[in-house]
Amino acid sequence: MLQVNNVGGVTKVSFEPDSKLNLAQASEVKAEFVNIVKGTGGRMELDMKNLEYVDSSGVGALLSLLRLCREFKWDLTLMGLQPSVRELFNLLQLHTIFKIK
């Protein structure tokens, strides 16, 4: 579900096209996040342009990623939020705790 590339010291993570982050995928995505983050810190850009839908389980997975990033000293930036996802982030005031480009 996630694609990972290291470019110039930045870990670039993106969702596969037409992805949804809901109850069915949240556990798998959380496990992938753990594998990416464990170890030394760094910079991560999570490109969400292909993420069409996020439910409460998906929000939980993203909050878990944020917690992991803080624990392992990663600088996390979210990018390319679709309008519906951005609206959800604004409604839940997640834009106040995530760095979003």
Predicted regions and their residues:
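Conserved beta-strand core positions
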Residues: 2, 11, 44, 74-76
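Short, glycine-/small-residue-enriched flexible loop/hinge segments at domain edges that mediate gating
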Residues: 34-56, 79
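STAS-typified acidic loop motif
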Residues: 5-31
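C-terminal structural segments of small proteins and small subunits
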Residues: 68-100
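Aromatic/hydrophobic pocket-lining residues that form π-stacking "cages" and hydrophobic walls in ligand
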Residues: 33, 65
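A short, glycine- and basic residue-enriched loop/turn
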Residues: 18, 51-54, 97
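Alpha-helical transmission elements in cytosolic ATPase-linked domains
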Residues: 28, 61-64, 84
